[in-house]
Amino acid sequence: MSEPKVRRWVGKYEVGRLIGECNFGKLRSAVDTETGDPVALMILDKDKVLKHKMAEQIKREISIMKLINHPNVVQLYEVLASKAKIYIVLEFISGGKLFDKIKNDGRMNEDEAQRYFQQLINAVDYCHSRGVYHRDLKPENLLLDAQENLKVAEFGLIALSQQAGGDGLRHTACGNPDYAAPEVLNDQGYDGAKADLWSCGVILFVLLAGYLPFEDSSLTTLYKKISSADFSCPPWLSSGVKNLIVRILDPNPMTRITIPEILEDVWFKKDYKPAVFEEKKEANLADVEAVFKDSEEGRVQLRSFPCVICSGGTTCGDVRSRTKLMNGLIERGRPQEAHSIFNTLIEEGHKPSLITYTTLVTALTRQKHFHSLLSLISKVEKNGLKPDTILFNAIINASSESGNLDQAMKIFEKMKESGCKPTASTFNTLIKGYGKIGKLEESSRLLDMMLRDEMLQPNDRTCNILVQAWCNQRKIEEAWNIVYKMQSYGVKPDVVTFNTLAKAYARIGSTCTAEDMIIPRMLHNKVKPNVRTCGTIVNGYCEEGKMEEALRFFYRMKELGVHPNLFVFNSLIKGFLNINDMDGVGEVVDLMEEFGVKPDVVTFSTLMNAWSSVGDMKRCEEIYTDMLEGGIDPDIHAFSILAKGYARAGEPEKAEQILNQMRKFGVRPNVVIYTQIISGWCSAGEMKKAMQVYKKMCGIVGLSPNLTTYETLIWGFGEAKQPWKAEELLKDMEGKNVVPTRKTMQLIADGWKSIGVSNSNDANTLGSSFSTSSKLNIPNNIASSRSPLFLKGMPEKPKLCIKSQFGLRQTLLVVLCRDQIGEAGRFCKFM
């Protein structure tokens, strides 16, 4: 057995995993072995610091942090040094960056943003009172502890008040321009306190809006916007916070609000709690110089050895606690971090337990890292552990998830050879795996093995897995045979079984069979239909265009004791839209209000798509506005509908503006939306702008174009009588690993034909000539027909005249598209 990797120590601190890196060193986690408390250890390379003449800045940073003792500022505990390294021991902050919280969760409500802003002002006010100015405040430099309290970090750019010029102003520009005050960018000297306050205002705006107040791809334009405070607050902010933001983001530092004035602001004072802490006495800064002295005094020694407890065959506390942490991270959707913790355990010389290995398998499965699963069993055995049933089941499940059933069966056989008895869960996993890849005969063989060889009783999960597998193959009769077979073993079908069968009937266009057969059998077996059962049947009728049947069953739901949910109403709306019956849509939305079901983004998107498809972007915009006023954030699908609609309506500039809207709501554009915008510009004959969008997508955004993107551009160049440019795109396609099809080549050929070239040799000659000659007068902006991307399946405009408007009442969508309908409407006959 190979020797475990050593554990490293700096003084009393046991060094852990790498957290981050910079030009001059690394940041690692560590543990104070005397107290057991976690710390962060900044390890700086002394030679690099001296070589780059950074010694004074490092001394200044240490001096500043020694001056500060505040609950909302990262604390410095101790500074140590060896001959080659400087060790700065800092408070360990476990909650991550405020920037990541905004990126992952989006904008905050005012109460949450207010709490963070109050803590930020507390910290900044304290630092300013000590003569310390940050000058680089931004969400990336604000950390959150385990209780989600804010901690200001990153003191590398701080300037002490003693370093001001003769005019009392600072003259060193630093920090992120997005958060920098106008006077900092203008480099005319500035007051550090007022500059920090501007940054606080930008941070408050970002917390509440989810995007920056000043944005532009051009740095010159961005500076102009910042210098003139050219921004607007989003409509959802209260007047109190709007007024405060405007007073903070005052471009004139002389009239800008001050911290004492902020502390008296009505919005700020709500639930305000001043920081409580013990004031630090004047720090002794004399020892800071000793950090760079080349003497043996005070140097720390590194020591290393494997974990004694683990080597003795007992699981140590570190392994137990970190395994628990791994489980927590996996549950929160962070398997990569769990995997990293496992690697750290190995690096530190610990011996993981079987539970730790099982947790690792779960993390690998979530990350879809399946290649090392088979070798994992050998590693467990080499560590002197015997794999148990739980570990085998986890590895079999991972192999099955990857689609590698051969590997799963090898592990299954190894499981039996090792003396571990397979469980019902083992067989269910294998049966499901073979069912997913369509090998149902193998699933049946495993069921027989389960019953015959292992004497195991199948359960309801076994039944549902097999029923689902046969239904996926559209072999409903075989699925029923499974139900009957399971009943003979005492396994009764449950609501999941019947829902699967109902969905299978609806999928083949036999929703009436689903209703006539499934519902009676459910009631006979004393299985209560749920909203999913009813939703499947309603949606099935809607998909088949049988709206009267859908409505009839909608009212039958009351008899079954099932309350309709949003899926049911969205299905009805979509069904009526598919047959161009806007009156039906209006009454369904009224029913939503009657049943107390609020619309969601799918509801709005469905209605937006209906109007967008017929070219009525005004109606589409009205619904979009209603959605925003109702407090519902649009998703990628809603934005895609807008972009596609504008492009199809010949308004590509509006389609491109959608990208700004998406950024405000924290929605990342995908290749589909960019392709729709490109298609709009191609249809307008604006190939230069189409290529600008294409380059932005590939370069700045980092998205990979797909075949549709390239074929849209090729079609556009063909319509613009520039087929040589279309042909040049083939090189881009090769570079992006996008394989052209017969259709791609036909589009290029059509482009050449449009300028009278049908021979490939002539095309090559002309292409070379066009790309090198400036004398040929070929217009770039030629009026063209719509792109093929938007001609597919365009519905005819509905004949019904819509007289009413879309609007909101009490945050519910109230669409009132009645056109000569009675008071009760057509639904009265079903009441």
UniProtKB/Swiss-Prot annotation:
Gene3D superfamilies: Tetratricopeptide repeat domain, Transferase(Phosphotransferase) domain 1. One of its GO terms (cellular component) is plastid. PPR repeats lie at residues 318-352, 353-387, 388-422, 423-457, 459-493, 494-529, 530-564, 565-599, 600-634, 635-669, 670-705, 706-740. SMART domains: S_TKc. One of its GO terms (molecular function) is mRNA binding. InterPro entries: Kinase-like_dom_sf, Pentatricopeptide_rpt, Prot_kinase_dom, Ser/Thr_kinase_AS, TPR-like_helical_dom_sf. Residues 13-268 form the Protein kinase domain. Keywords: Repeat. The protein kinase domain is predicted to be catalytically inactive. In the N-terminal section; belongs to the protein kinase superfamily. Ser/Thr protein kinase family. In the C-terminal section; belongs to the PPR family. P subfamily. This is Pentatricopeptide repeat-containing protein At5g21222. It comes from Arabidopsis thaliana (Mouse-ear cress).
